[in-house]
Amino acid sequence: MDLNGETSTKRKRSSVAAPAERPAKHLKPESSTLTPGDATPANGTVYDVEDEEDTGRVMPIGPAQADSPEWQATIEKVVKSVVSIHFCQTCSFDTDLSMSSQATGFVVDAERGYILTNRHVVCAGPFWGYCIFDNHEECDVRPVYRDPVHDFGILKFDPKAIRYMELTELKLRPEAARVGCEIRVVGNDAGEKLSILSGVISRLDRNAPEYGDGYCDFNTNYIQAAAAASGGSSGSPVVNIDGHAIALQAGGRADGAATDYFLPLDRPLRALECIRRGEPVARGTIQTQWILKPFDECRRLGLTPEWEAAVRKASPHETSMLVAEIILPEGPADGKLEEGDVLLQVNGELLTQFIRLDDILDSSVGKTVRLLVQRGGQNVEVECEVGDLHAITPDRFVTVAGGTFHNLSYQQARLYAIAARGVYVCEAAGSFKLENTLSGWIIDAVDKRPTRNLDEFTEVMKTIPDRARVVISYRHIRDLHTRGTSIVYIDRHWHPKMRMAIRNDETGLWDFSDLADPVPAETPVPRKADFIQLDGVSQPAVADIVRSFVRVSCTMPLKLDGYPQAKKTGFGLVIDAEKGLVVVSRAIVPYNLCDINITVADSIIVAAKVIFLHPLQNYTIIQYDPSLVQAPVQSAKLSTEYIKQGQETIFVGFNQNFRIVVAKTAVTDITTVSIPANASAPRYRAINLDAITVDTGLSGQCTNGVLIGEDGVVQALWLNYLGERTPSSHKDVEYHLGFATPALLPVTSKIQQGIIPKLRILNMESYVVQMSQARIMGVSEEWIQKVAQANPSRHQLFMVRKVDCPPPQFTDNADSLQEGDIILTLDGQLITRVSELDKMYEKEVLDALIVRNGQEMHLKLPTVPTEDLETDRAVVFCGAVLQKPHHAVRQQISKLHSEVYVSARSRGSPAYQYGLAPTNFITAVNGVPTPNLDSFVREVSKIPDNTYFRLRAVTFDNVPWVVTMKKNDHYFPMSEYVKDPSQPLGWRTVSHDRDRHKDGITPDAANLNPDAMDEVYEEVSDVEPEVD
């Protein structure tokens, strides 16, 4: 952590930032890439501002010249009031995703400890943060007010916490803002501790800028100037030469223009005065958006010359009037006002400015106002009841089944011109992860019952049992024309808590309470079904293979082992119908902390569990209860002979639409491969396997299937293999390859006998060398001849590419393999095929003959038990997922620095804010070594809440560093997932926050949502909404 407040995250050097899915704000590019902002993914779309705004007068100003003594004195005084704000929104809420960022604020009441900043900094949802003063003193801040519409909010700090400098405040002088006024913007520009930008006010009557799909201000004018502020300057004071704050920095352009937009301080000043007096900040609304339009446009809308003359006479300097832009359905003005109405009077008062309109509405909550408008040249007078703006601004949310919900906000309703009602999904995760989109859904009905608001939704969810499948009806707020219908699986076992969070403006926290215990799952009952028939397939044995396929859906409640997804679906092959055994790709079922459901004959859905995970060859064995399936499921016949290159076969696979396809083809190649390692974060990959490719285009379209002979015997599985993430597109590569069935038999035969294999493996990754290379590296002519005789089809040996980092109980010794060794024999058998390496599975020690540095050597090679390589425990601490280094980490690193490895982190968490990145190792807490998870949990349990502590960490590239972090038990209590075969789920969850969770069950908070977790490094950003 740099002293100036900028976060410098330590990570693997080659890692990349993974873009989120739906943009919410749009920020200025830095170094040719879009900078993520307060809720802004790196791939944010840029939106155009209305053309009218682009024609505004701009007075370009270059860098500040040598300031006059007056300006120097002013700046010296102002900087003592400016603070750098470091903050997080702990979970997605309303228009913003969970995030961590930096911004600016300034003290407006030194005695009471009030800081003025932007509303998009204070956040609509749960906030935690701190501020740093000019002398680098730090103190916590909490929100006391965020405006429902306008882009300002007020934070509170404890003035007594600042001991080494005299606190000063800036006076708010909104009336001092004038065209031509020279100004300075003093703030945390581009993440720097202090930047001073100069400019000149060019406009006072600009409409509020549109930032796209995220939070946008409206119903106010903005001030325009050329100051070239950027990310991090949000909330900066705009000061004049007298040292008074005359505006608030709010946003800027994303196209490189030096234009900035400032919020006038009239409404912030009023709110501050109310808070000082201990009064609520009343906010009124008739749910109508107004915009300023110049007189020429108003005339085209029907403004009569008489009224124009009256307005110009009353306000000689006015050039525009207020025109209705959006009237929300079901609002107070619905059916009374129309879009395009030109506002003339309110309560008999001629009115052309937003400020006066706000004054009237804010003082008339619960009352009626009279509006006179012109519509097509005709005077129309209407009466509207003024509603409470706070009442249609959500101040609570509910988390259930992994998702987060609240009432639709006025912000979202205004943006899409819809009624301000409905249940909004602000965190589409868990059971409610709909169409792979993070947020934006409106739930219309659940289980065939309407959910018009959050209360109705909550009552419906209380009655739905765990593991039930219910029909939901929904629309996305960006496409309200299309109504979707889906069946969702209600998860109340990994997410047992149904909780409500309510904003508490006294404490600045959101108070959580449990709403209802989960309804127990109903006992599954057997069901009947028939399989489809493959028409046009001449071989009956081939057509019958359809009875051996099942669809497999795997959902992970927590990101482990660097796996990038929270849900994956594919197909598995039934290898024993009587016992319910299915083999499936490990790219679909990566680890056993998961929910697995299989679908038989596209009709029967039953649960399954992990029986076996192969450490090297990319397959998982799962098991379901066959007594629940009354369908003619057939065990696939697996070939005991390896398929050969050039051999004809029949490809049967499933395309992207889950439709089965069949094609006659031939094997084009069988090559020994290892799936490329992922550079940004190690994760499971297949190594040391013979990959089969076939001569059909369907092979690239199908992720799962089989190669089958005309006799119906399965010769190979067709599997998907998770590969590397491409640096350019940030997408994960999947390989589709065949895997010969004889390689399965040593494992499947034991499992069918009721024995779970405990394999042992050599601690290495190898690759093929041809005889020309082997000869150069010292392999004798005698051995080259033996290779040719032993494997006529492929003359090859295996060279050690990488030796894995061994488990702690294994120490380096002279009988260990080294990179570059060529393996000749194991236990006296010449090794020229991958299948011949299988002898390592059951041997603790192998007698090996190798060639090293041109010399033949005999070694006693110890093998490693694979059960020690699978993850059996995870600790979630301050938003970071910690585990023992999994197998992929050991494959890619040469030394384990500790057994406390950061596998993932939640956005908006302390881990994210302070830069503790995935792939880091934690070696000590407050100077006490923590070599394993037990010692880590013991030490961090001693740390009080809201207290700083030190973590000593080491990056994947062996760079040691120290991170200071503040503990936050309110939003991020420590919890654990521990593998426990005695539990129904195979795991138990434990909360270490016993005071609030006496049942020991981890709360289902949005910060444990795997879709809000990053398993790779992603930069922490500065907040600055911008438009193009």
From Swiss-Prot:
Region (Serine protease): 82-266
InterPro entries, alphabetized: PDZ, PDZ-like_dom, PDZ_6, PDZ_sf, Peptidase_S1_PA, Peptidase_S1C
One of the record's GO cellular component terms: nucleus
SUPFAM superfamilies linked: PDZ domain-like, Trypsin-like serine proteases
Pfam families (alphabetical): PDZ_1, PDZ_6, Trypsin_2
EC number: 3.4.21.-
Biased composition, class Basic and acidic residues, residue ranges: 990-1001
Domain (PDZ) ranges: 305-377, 876-957
Residues covered by region (Disordered): 1-46, 989-1028
Compositional bias annotation for Acidic residues: 1012-1028
Keyword Hydrolase set for record: yes
A Gene Ontology BP annotation from the UniProt entry: proteolysis
Main localisation: nucleus
GO molecular function: serine-type endopeptidase activity
PANTHER family: PRO-APOPTOTIC SERINE PROTEASE NMA111
Protein family membership: Belongs to the peptidase S1C family.
Role of this protein: Nuclear serine protease which mediates apoptosis.
Protein name per Swiss-Prot or TrEMBL: Pro-apoptotic serine protease nma111
